[in-house]
C-alpha cells in the first residue's frame, strides 16, 4: 500500500490546505485510506478532515473545505495506491494465453481487479475476491462491476476457469444483485 503523496495538483484544496509532497495519507473523515476507492469515496464530502503522517513521523490533521465531489488534488506513486490484482484462474479460453509473443508487456498482465472493473470498465471473474472485498463493494456502493460469467453451472464454471474455488464467484454475484449493478454479457446460440 502506497499512500505517500508524490504530487499535489496546483490550486487544489490540498495545496491550499498546506499538504506537502512526501506526507502519507492516513485517514479521511476518520476512515483509513487503503486505495483509490477509499480516497474517492471518503473524500467526496465538502468538509474533509485529512489525517497525515509527516516525513518526520508526526501525525497531523488538516481540515479542507471544498465543493462536494471535488478532488482533494493528491497524487500517489500508482493510480490504485496499491498493487493491481492479477487473475488466479487457468481458463481454458484465456485470451492472454493465446496472444502471440513479442507484444508490449502490459498486454500480458492478467488483471482480475474489481477496482479496475469499476474505474476503467475491465471485466473480472470475481474468483480472487475475499469476503472483505465483496462486502466493501457493497458498503462503498461500487457500481457498475463488469463480470465474465461464462456459465452458471457451478461444476462447469470451475472447470472452464480452471479454478476449484471459482464456484464462490457465483455466490458473490447472487449476494450483490441487490446492491451493485453487475454487467453480465450473454451469448445467444
Regions flagged by a language model, labelled:
Residues 13-17, 40-41:
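Short, surface-exposed secondary-structure edge patches
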Amino acid at each position: 500500500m502506497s499512500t505517500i503523496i508524490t504530487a499535489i495538483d496546483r490550486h487544489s484544496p490540498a495545496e491550499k490546505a498546506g499538504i506537502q509532497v512526501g506526507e502519507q495519507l492516513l485517514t479521511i473523515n476518520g476512515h483509513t485510506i487503503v486505495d483509490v476507492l477509499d480516497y474517492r469515496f471518503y473524500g467526496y464530502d465538502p468538509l474533509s478532515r485529512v489525517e497525515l503522517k509527516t516525513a518526520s513521523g508526526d501525525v497531523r490533521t488538516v481540515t479542507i473545505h471544498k465543493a462536494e465531489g471535488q478532488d482533494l488534488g493528491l497524487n500517489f506513486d500508482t493510480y490504485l495506491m496499491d498493487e493491481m490484482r492479477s487473475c488466479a484462474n487457468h481458463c481454458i479460453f484465456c485470451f492472454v494465453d493465446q496472444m502471440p509473443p513479442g507484444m508490449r508487456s502490459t498486454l500480458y498482465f492478467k488483471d482480475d481487479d474489481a477496482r479496475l472493473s469499476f474505474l476503467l470498465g475491465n471485466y473480472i471473474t470475481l474468483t480472487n475476491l475475499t469476503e472483505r472485498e465483496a462486502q466493501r463493494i457493497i458498503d462503498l456502493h461500487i457500481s457498475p462491476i463488469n463480470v465474465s460469467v461464462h456459465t452458471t453451472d457451478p461444476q462447469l464454471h470451475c472447470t472452464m476457469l480452471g479454478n476449484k474455488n471459482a464456484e464462490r464467484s457465483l455466490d458473490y454475484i447472487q449476494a450483490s444483485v441487490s446492491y451493485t449493478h453487475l454487467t453480465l454479457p450473454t451469448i445467444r446460440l
